[in-house]
Amino acid sequence: MSENKTSLSYKDAGVDIDAGNQLVERIKSVTKKTHRPEVKGNLGGFGALCELPTKYKKPLLVSGTDGVGTKLRVAMDANRHDGVGIDLVAMCVNDLIVQGAEPLFFLDYYATGKLDVDVAASVVTGIGAGCEQAGCALIGGETAEMPGMYHDGDYDIAGFCVGVVEADNVIDGTNVKPGQKLIALGSSGPHSNGYSLVRKIIEVSGADVNAELNGKPIIDQLLEPTRIYVKSVLALLEEVQVSAISHITGGGFWENIPRVLPEDAKVVIDEKSWEWPAVFSWLQENGNVTRHEMYRTFNCGVGLVIVVDDADTEQAVNILKQHGENAWVIGDIASKDGEEQVEINA
């Protein structure tokens, strides 16, 4: 046996602990900006501690986890990483708010083949910005450098969020009934869904994503961060009784709206009530995508659908607009008269 063996280190195997520590130091200021009084302890412990807000009498915890999907590939190809952190938070907190839950805290998971501290810091800075928008604390996370699992420049991210709602105020769709109105909240773009189709459309059509569409580069519109609806919806819930909320994500209108409807109800949507943002028409045209497939894959300009009583409609729209939302009446609740629970009238 040779006495001149090379001494190997973790860094020789492709894992740079020093780079990981450097990242932690860079993101400490990000987490501080998101602090909530319920959070105890500092970043870096084995676990994060959080009390329940004292204002809740019968608190129920609501949890969710999500990712950004292949929008990451578009972001990596464009070398633009700041927006996907906001996307990550949005996909989680918007799922919580549809049940009436206030997001409390958020954790992230960042996995890569070779840690680029600048890229990772950009992503986490975006996560912090998203948490600020949602009013939740970024209390921890995991950075995994895994050589051989990912190409060096690639990464994946996942988010985990916990919120709280008063047990008597959970929004679950049980109070939905015919005659109620649907209010749409406008999206900022495709949000974080349908990007495998987006990429296929770009590939097949050969379209130049750096070209301008309505005065703005297409790539900017595709990478526009997902809108976070938390604060505007929480403000609405203070004033108006809401029967259901649907987050229009993967599966589009056809899949997501029925998730919050009773079996005997359907929605009747007036397609004339809004105009698709230009990026969706561009995708449909360049991919020759059918209308049905567009509504099955993309949000087509509608990020949330909220169900309220007819008498509360005007007040609800006004509150949402006062909090910066593009809100409008998009349709009605009706009795189901067939198999379909979503009817979109052109």
UniProtKB/Swiss-Prot annotation:
Location(s) in or outside the cell: Cytoplasm
Primary gene name: purM
Pfam families in alphabetical order: AIRS, AIRS_C
Pathway this chain belongs to: Purine metabolism; IMP biosynthesis via de novo pathway; 5-amino-1-(5-phospho-D-ribosyl)imidazole from N(2)-formyl-N(1)-(5-phospho-D-ribosyl)glycinamide: step 2/2
GO molecular function: ATP binding; phosphoribosylamine-glycine ligase activity; phosphoribosylformylglycinamidine cyclo-ligase activity
Listed name of the protein: Phosphoribosylformylglycinamidine cyclo-ligase
EC number, as in UniProt: 6.3.3.1
Family: Belongs to the AIR synthase family.
Organism: Alteromonas mediterranea (strain DSM 17117 / CIP 110805 / LMG 28347 / Deep ecotype)
GO cellular component, one term: cytosol
Primary enzyme class: ligase
Keyword entries, A-Z: ATP-binding, Cytoplasm, Ligase, Nucleotide-binding, Purine biosynthesis
NCBIfam families per the UniProt record, alphabetical: purM
Entry-linked Gene3D superfamilies: PurM-like C-terminal domain (3.90.650.10), PurM-like, N-terminal domain (3.30.1330.10)
InterPro entries given in the database record: PurM-like_C_dom (IPR010918), PurM-like_C_sf (IPR036676), PurM-like_N (IPR016188), PurM-like_N_sf (IPR036921), PurM_cligase (IPR004733)
BP-aspect Gene Ontology terms: 'de novo' IMP biosynthetic process; adenine biosynthetic process
Catalysed reaction equations from the record: 2-formamido-N(1)-(5-O-phospho-beta-D-ribosyl)acetamidine + ATP = 5-amino-1-(5-phospho-beta-D-ribosyl)imidazole + ADP + phosphate + H(+)
